[in-house]
């Protein structure tokens, strides 16, 4: 059980909806599994944090997949999450790292690139999917998710994401927030929010200082204005299994399976999301062939 969690809140009498997350241990689990280098860890961790909070907006068995592809050296960052606080992610090139940028921070923009898009696919059940996309405008990811909400979901939002990495590549702190303006919000409320966000300390610094998700929202919105509705745990969780990969092998067709038996006398599958390996014996593949006959 991790100490990570997300809070859902309202502020300014329901004019603002807010989510904040602590994801240090969750991102650490992904870093350990994929052996990401610091810049890749920051990019993956920011994407995981945003995806976990987007998952918290879903209901029941709904889930979503986020693909960040800025055509940069890191390749694609793929994360998915559900409404239960379970999130997983991987990057195409985990050993991506660059010198710090001019601000002395991890150069996420350089790793991600700025020539692609963020694609969000929500599985809302009953074989019904919602898909949205927006161009990458910054490469730092917080601004890119902000832009996604404004253009794809027509929800004025502010997304802040932060990941700090220790010298030994472990994750020192990770977390973030999504603050959304609800229809009918007063101009005065929006102005207060914009001012608070423009003046705030960077998210990763606030988490490093030990601020909880509740503390993060209080810092931005003011303690008197925030009403916490719910708190839910967040963790790295992968739903891969021996059976799921066996079904995937079945989908390759008879000729390919016969080839595996003849050439390799079995098969091995590796999960992109968690790195788990699954081995399939010649006998298992023969049984699979019989089921296709």
Curated annotation (Swiss-Prot):
GO BP: protein refolding
Family per similarity comment: Belongs to the HSP33 family.
Protein name: 33 kDa chaperonin
Gene designation: hslO
Record flagged with keyword Chaperone: yes
Cellular-component GO terms for this entry: cytoplasm
Compartment list: Cytoplasm
The entry's keywords: Chaperone, Cytoplasm, Disulfide bond, Redox-active center, Zinc
Known role: Redox regulated molecular chaperone. Protects both thermally unfolding and oxidatively damaged proteins from irreversible aggregation. Plays an important role in the bacterial defense system toward oxidative stress.
Post-translational modification summary for this protein: Under oxidizing conditions two disulfide bonds are formed involving the reactive cysteines. Under reducing conditions zinc is bound to the reactive cysteines and the protein is inactive.
Alphabetical list of Pfam families matching this protein: HSP33
Signal peptide start-end: none
């Amino acid at each position: 059980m991790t100490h990570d969690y997300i809070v859902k809140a309202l502020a300014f009498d329901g004019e603002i909806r807010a989510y904040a997350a602590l994801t240090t241990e969750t991102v650490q689990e992904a870093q350990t599994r994929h052996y990401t280098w610091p810049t890749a860890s920051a990019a993956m961790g920011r994407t995981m944090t945003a995806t976990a909070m987007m998952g918290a907006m879903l209901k029941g068995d709904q889930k979503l997949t986020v693909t960040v592809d800025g055509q940069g050296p890191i390749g694609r960052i793929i994360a998915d999450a559900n409404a239960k606080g379970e999130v997983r992610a991987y990057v195409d090139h985990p050993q991506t790292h660059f010198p710090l940028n001019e601000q002395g921070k991890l150069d996420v923009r350089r790793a991600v690139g700025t020539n692609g898009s963020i694609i969000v696919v929500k599985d809302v059940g009953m074989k019904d999917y919602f898909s949205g996309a927006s161009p990458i405008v910054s490469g730092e990811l917080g601004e890119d998710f902000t832009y996604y909400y404004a253009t794809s979901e027509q929800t004025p939002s502010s997304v802040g994401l932060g990941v700090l990495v220790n010298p030994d590549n472990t994750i020192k702190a990770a977390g973030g927030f999504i603050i959304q303006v609800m229809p009918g919000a007063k101009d005065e409320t929006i102005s207060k929010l914009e001012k608070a966000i423009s003046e705030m300390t960077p998210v990763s610094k606030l988490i490093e200082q030990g601020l909880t998700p509740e503390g993060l929202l209080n810092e931005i919105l003011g303690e008197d204005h925030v009403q916490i509705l719910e708190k839910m745990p967040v963790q790295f969780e992968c739903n891969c299994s021996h059976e799921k990969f066996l079904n995937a092998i079945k989908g390759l067709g008879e000729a390919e399976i016969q080839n595996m038996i003849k050439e390799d006398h079995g098969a091995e599958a590796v999960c992109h999301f968690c790195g788990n390996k699954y081995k399939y014996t010649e006998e298992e593949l023969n049984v699979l062939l019989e089921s296709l006959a």
